[in-house]
Structure formats: C-alpha cells, structure tokens
C-alpha cells in the first residue's frame, strides 16, 4: 500500500501524539508499505525521527509552530512565558476556525496536491480538526479511501471548550467528514462506541501501546536512599489535579517522619504543583526538574521506584487512554494514579495489579508507606510484572490498525480497479 499519513504532530516534536503517529509510520514501513507523512515544519526538538527507506516526510510551513520558544530560559521567566503563551493560545483558539492549524492545513494540502505521487489510502490522525479536513479533501482529490485516527474525540469530546453556535458548526462539519471515512480508529472501547453511535461507520480500537525497544537498554537499578516517585508530562490544574497525591505525601511525612521520599516532576512548568509544594511545606521532598526529551523521560521512568499518573477525575474521562499509561506499563514500575476511578486507564491498572488507583490522600499515604518500607527492607521496589504486556506493544497495535485498514478499503479498491 501507498499510505498518506497526515498529522501536524510528528518528531522531532516531543508529544505523545507524535509518538503514536511516528510508530504507525515506522511499523507500516517495516511491513513493506510506502508511507508518506504530511506534517508541519517545527523548531521543536526532543523526539527522534523514524528513519526507514519506505518513509518520506513532507513538511508544510506553519506560522504558529514558528512562534514556539526554542531557547532555554531561567525557570521563573519560563513559567511567566508559559502562562502568557497558554492564555494567548486559548484566546486565539476561540477566534480561529476550525483551529490554529488552519494555515498549515492549506499549505499541507497544496504540498500534497502539487506532487505527482498518489496514495492508495489517506489516513488522518486528529485532533486538530484541521488534520481531518485536510485528509478529507485529499482523499476526495485522489479518489481513494479515507481513514480517521481519533486520538481524542473532537466535537463530541467532554473536553470541548467552545460555545453552542460553534459547537453546532463543528458537529455538522465533523459529521460530514466522518461519514466519508471507510474506517474510524480510536484509543478505547468507550470512545469507539461513541463514534459508532455518532457516525455509523466501521470502527476499530487501536491502543497507544508502548515500544519494548524504548526500554531494552534501560534497567531499574535502585539507588540507596529515599523512595523516588517520578511524574512525566503535563500537570493541568483544571483536569489533572496533583492535590490528592501531594496531600498524601504530606500526610505520610506527618505520620512517619522517619521515612524518606523524593518526588520529581518533569514537563512544562506546573504552577499548581509549585503552589501546593509551598502550601504543604514539601520543598524538601518535592521538586520540579524542568522539561526533558523523550529518551530521557523513558530513562527516568525506568529508573524510578514508582510512577505518578495524574488524570482527570470526571466521568468524561471514562474512555481516555493516554499514551503515558502505556509508557508506564513498559517501564514496569508501580503506578500511582489519581483521576476517574472507573476509567479504562484505572481498570487496566487495577485489574492487572499494576499499582493503585485512588483520590484518597490517606490511601495514597498508606501505599507510599508500603513502598518506602519495602525499599528500606529489600533495597528496591519490585516491579508489578505484567504477563499480558505484549498485547499492548506499538507493533501489535500498529499491525492491528493496518489489518483493519486493509480490510476496510479492500472492497473500495476492487471497485475502483473494476
């Protein structure tokens, strides 16, 4: 197959969404298919690009991407800039339809149409909404099947942030685009069911998964001293509340001051974490370490005694299956999750004894005490072990998606050939 894979997020941009799309490209290329990636130019770094003779990467200009800061700054300045940028982003997002990737979308569409290369299928991974619009138009232009990979839901998402009038517009346009697709993919059963009901199209679940190769040279080699907890990624005060966990740490130290613990946060500046550190007098044990590249993030996860996963405590989170969950599975360290306790992520952790899922600070304190005492006694914290982990690899999930694509488009290709 000649596959046109569309997403503005792609390495070297260090995002979980870019990891998912890059692994699709890599695995499909390994399977012998020609993959052309249509993405954006970006000054971002931190994630290794896939290199394979069957992959070609085509980048269209994106004015928004060029505005991203690339130079390091002092921590206080970086926090201020991050807060300002986030506010400006939210404001701009509300004024531009369908989203801030609109200019990139036009450039990407022109770039693809000016080329003589012709795909057998167009696969668009979204959001943003623009990626779906570009995919829809190019599939029509080339008269080939169209497939949508919903990493997140869009107009039907619980995260939808705009008003009623715009919501009606987005719903109408997305309905038209989604019903054009031969296949819809998404990351969990609950989201797949929503898509099926909304758009009445064939749907497949393609988990984010993890890549065992990312961890093959990484080992858990515990260092003497405190129990070390690591969090990698965004901390959003409105959706990923660190409060229950940090209050659990505070409670542990109040009840068992002799125990040693160290908590490190890596990622964009987490203002709410810094505020709570001060309020709870946790400066001695909780630190913000800044942003790191993807390879370093994986190493930090593998070296930690346990990992912290912050998700939204809301029923709308039921079907959200972050790629970070699977990286943590690959690291084989105990997971401490806060958020919606009936979500698919919570079920994966609870049903497979991969750690603890709770928003109760007392339970968190008790669990941390168990881990700290285990390390004190044995010199390490045992990994949970997960016999079924192979089902959750990127290879397996990418092949599953590829099989579904081939099955979905086969009748259309035969019809077109006839």
What are these regions (language model features)?
Residues 39-107:
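A conserved catalytic-core segment of Leloir-type glycosyltransferases
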Residues 4, 221-239, 246-247, 397:
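Conserved donor-binding/catalytic core segment of Leloir-type glycosyltransferases
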Residues 236, 240-243, 293-300, 307-329, ...:
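Nucleotide-sugar-dependent
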Residues 1-65, 183, 203, 252, ...:
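N-terminal subdomain of nucleotide-sugar transferases
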Residues 256, 260, 267, 272-298:
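Nucleotide-activated donor-binding/catalytic signature segment of Leloir-type glycosyltransferases, i.e.
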């Amino acid at each position: 197959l000649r596959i046109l894979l569309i997403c503005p997020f792609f390495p070297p941009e260090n995002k979980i969404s870019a990891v998912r799309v890059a692994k699709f490209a890599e695995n499909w290329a390994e399977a012998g298919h020609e993959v052309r990636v249509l993405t954006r130019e970006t000054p971002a770094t931190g994630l290794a690009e896939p290199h394979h003779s069957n992959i070609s990467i085509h980048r269209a200009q994106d004015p928004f991407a060029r505005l991203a800061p690339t130079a390091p700054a002092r921590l206080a300045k970086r926090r201020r800039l991050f807060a300002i940028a986030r506010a400006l982003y939210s404001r701009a997002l509300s004024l531009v339809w369908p989203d801030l990737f609109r200019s990139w979308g036009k450039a990407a569409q022109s770039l693809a149409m000016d080329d003589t290369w012709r795909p057998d299928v167009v696969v668009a991974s979204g959001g943003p909404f623009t990626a779906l619009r570009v995919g829809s138009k190019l599939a029509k232009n080339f008269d080939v099947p169209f497939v949508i990979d919903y990493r997140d839901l869009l107009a039907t998402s619980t995260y939808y942030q705009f008003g009623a009038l715009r919501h009606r517009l987005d719903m109408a346009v997305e309905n038209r685009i989604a019903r054009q697709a031969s296949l819809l993919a998404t990351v969990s059963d609950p989201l797949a069911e929503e898509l099926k009901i909304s758009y009445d199209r064939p749907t497949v679940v393609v988990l984010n998964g993890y890549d065992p190769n990312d961890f093959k040279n990484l080992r858990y080699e515990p260092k003497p001293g405190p129990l070390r907890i690591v969090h990698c990624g965004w901390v959003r005060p409105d959706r990923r509340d660190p409060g229950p966990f940090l209050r659990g740490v505070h409670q542990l130290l109040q009840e068992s001051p002799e125990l040693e613990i160290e908590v490190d946060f890596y990622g964009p500046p987490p203002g709410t974490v810094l505020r709570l550190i001060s309020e709870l007098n946790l400066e001695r044990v909780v630190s913000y370490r800044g942003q790191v590249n993807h390879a370093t993030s994986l190493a930090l996860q593998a070296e930690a005694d346990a990992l912290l996963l912050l998700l939204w405590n809301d029923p709308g989170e039921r079907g959200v299956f972050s790629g970070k969950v699977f990286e943590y599975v690959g690291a084989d360290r105990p997971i401490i999750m806060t958020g919606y306790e009936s979500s698919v992520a919570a079920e994966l952790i609870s049903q497979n004894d991969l750690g603890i899922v709770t928003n109760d600070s007392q339970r968190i304190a008790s669990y941390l005490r168990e881990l700290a005492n285990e390390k004190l006694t044995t010199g390490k914290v045992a990994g949970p072990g997960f016999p079924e982990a192979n089902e959750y690899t990127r290879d397996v999930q990418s092949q599953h998606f590829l099989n579904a694509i081939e099955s979905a488009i086969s009748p259309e290709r035969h019809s077109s050939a006839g």
